[in-house]
């Protein structure tokens, strides 16, 4: 008799995705981040659901409702810190996942890559709106500054900002709509993740060598289920150490002060995972130019398949491009550091240089080096 997992309509889908899925035999730990991101999303949805049961999206009570969750709700402090630090963990996994895709040429699976970019943008939007909800000082001023960037759009900018605010400043209407969107977006992300997987399983996984692996596939279970479980255990260990020992290390102390429209914090900055983009935004003196650079710093990922000049898919056997890739990684860390610094010398100059280098590396240096490597290999 045929196994039920191969005949039952629902089990069949799970079977083809997680059990009998033909997987390259040589994929490394860098391929663990997909499952870790799925885990992060589930943790965020579950903790978020419990937080939403006690949270009130009103400007007068939002801050105190978060304090109430931490003080009076059973394990409320744990749920709140798991949700806040879960977002940081989500972005660590997300950036490593994208970096892996860039390194091993996964962007040549166009549909999977483009859905992935949509996922990245959706997660960024969700995280930004979630940061506004506790209604602390940085929540309020962060929301004011970032939404105000839309006013740089010619002709419709000012009207667009007021339409998003629901008034003439960030207020009750803004908070309520941000809560509504923050609640619904993770479910859209879940649907997009399923489409991401659907397209991935159409073409099959890439592998570190970048070569076709049809002749050497193994079933996903037990080989990669056990590998993913190991990744999950290590991630959970790191996560719980972060949540239980230093839950506020990645947050901003200003957010423990209730929002006050009359007092501007000395340094307005977003959460750490947006600092690289914020540094690129600040490095251009012109408002519209800064906004365009900010948007393009993420959307540049769409161009990667067009900028792939090498005859090899992966960077595994391309040492010169590898060097540039790691310079890019260091550059992004530099931008993250600069984004958290005040706007003064020498940080302005460092930020401008790092921003120029970021675009130069992706748009010119890496493609040209790829061509040069092909020439060196007499291809």
Curated annotation (Swiss-Prot):
GO terms for biological process: mitochondrial electron transport, ubiquinol to cytochrome c. The keyword Membrane applies. It is a multi-pass membrane protein. One of its GO terms (molecular function) is metal ion binding. It holds the Pfam family Cytochrom_B_C. One of its GO terms (cellular component) is mitochondrial inner membrane. Keywords: Electron transport, Heme, Iron, Membrane, Metal-binding, Mitochondrion, Mitochondrion inner membrane, Respiratory chain, Transmembrane, Transmembrane helix, Transport, Ubiquinone. It comes from the Eukaryota. It is found in: Mitochondrion inner membrane. Its cofactor is heme b. SUPFAM superfamilies: a domain/subunit of cytochrome bc1 complex (Ubiquinol-cytochrome c reductase), Transmembrane di-heme cytochromes. Its main location: mitochondrion. The keyword Transmembrane helix applies. The cytochrome bc1 complex contains 11 subunits: 3 respiratory subunits (MT-CYB, CYC1 and UQCRFS1), 2 core proteins (UQCRC1 and UQCRC2) and 6 low-molecular weight proteins (UQCRH/QCR6, UQCRB/QCR7, UQCRQ/QCR8, UQCR10/QCR9, UQCR11/QCR10 and a cleavage product of UQCRFS1). This cytochrome bc1 complex then forms a dimer. Belongs to the cytochrome b family. Component of the ubiquinol-cytochrome c reductase complex (complex III or cytochrome b-c1 complex) that is part of the mitochondrial respiratory chain. The b-c1 complex mediates electron transfer from ubiquinol to cytochrome c. Contributes to the generation of a proton gradient across the mitochondrial membrane that is then used for ATP synthesis. Heme 1 (or BL or b562) is low-potential and absorbs at about 562 nm, and heme 2 (or BH or b566) is high-potential and absorbs at about 566 nm. This is Cytochrome b. It comes from Aplodontia rufa.
């Amino acid at each position: 008799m045929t196994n039920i997992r191969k005949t039952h309509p629902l089990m069949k889908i799970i079977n083809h995705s997680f059990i009998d899925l033909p997987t390259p035999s040589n994929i490394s730990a860098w391929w663990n981040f997909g499952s870790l991101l799925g885990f992060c999303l589930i943790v965020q949805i579950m903790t978020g659901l419990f937080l939403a049961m006690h949270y009130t999206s009103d400007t007068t009570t939002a801050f105190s409702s978060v304090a109430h969750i931490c003080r009076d709700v059973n394990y409320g402090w744990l749920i709140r810190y798991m949700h806040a630090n879960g977002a940081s963990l989500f972005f660590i996994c997300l950036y490593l996942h994208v970096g892996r895709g860039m390194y091993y040429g996964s962007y040549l699976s166009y549909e999977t890559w483009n859905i992935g970019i949509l996922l990245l943008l959706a997660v960024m939007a969700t995280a930004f709106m979630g940061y506004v909800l506790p209604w602390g000082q940085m929540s309020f001023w962060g929301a004011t500054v970032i939404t105000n960037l839309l006013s740089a759009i010619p002709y419709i900018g000012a009207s667009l900002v007021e339409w998003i605010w629901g008034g003439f400043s960030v207020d009750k209407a803004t908070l309520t709509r941000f809560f509504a969107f923050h609640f619904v977006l993770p479910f859209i992300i879940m649907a997009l993740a399923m489409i991401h997987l659907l397209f991935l399983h159409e073409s099959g996984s890439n592998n570190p060598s970048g070569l076709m692996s049809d002749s050497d596939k193994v079933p996903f279970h037990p080989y990669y289920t056990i590998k993913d479980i190991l990744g999950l255990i290590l991630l959970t260990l790191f996560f719980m150490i972060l949540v239980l020992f230093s839950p506020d290390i990645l947050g901003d102390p200003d957010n423990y002060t209730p929002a006050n429209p009359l007092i501007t914090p000395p340094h307005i900055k977003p959460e750490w995972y947006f600092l690289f983009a914020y540094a690129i935004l600040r490095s251009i003196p012109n408002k519209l130019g800064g906004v365009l650079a900010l948007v393009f710093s993420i959307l540049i990922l769409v161009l990667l398949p067009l900028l792939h000049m090498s005859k090899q898919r992966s960077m595994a056997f391309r040492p010169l491009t590898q060097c540039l890739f790691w310079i890019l990684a260091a550059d992004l860390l530099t931008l993250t550091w600069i984004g958290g610094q005040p706007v003064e010398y020498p940080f302005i100059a460092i930020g401008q240089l790092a921003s120029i280098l970021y675009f130069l590396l992706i748009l010119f240096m890496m493609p040209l080096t790829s061509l040069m490597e092909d020439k060196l290999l007499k291809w």
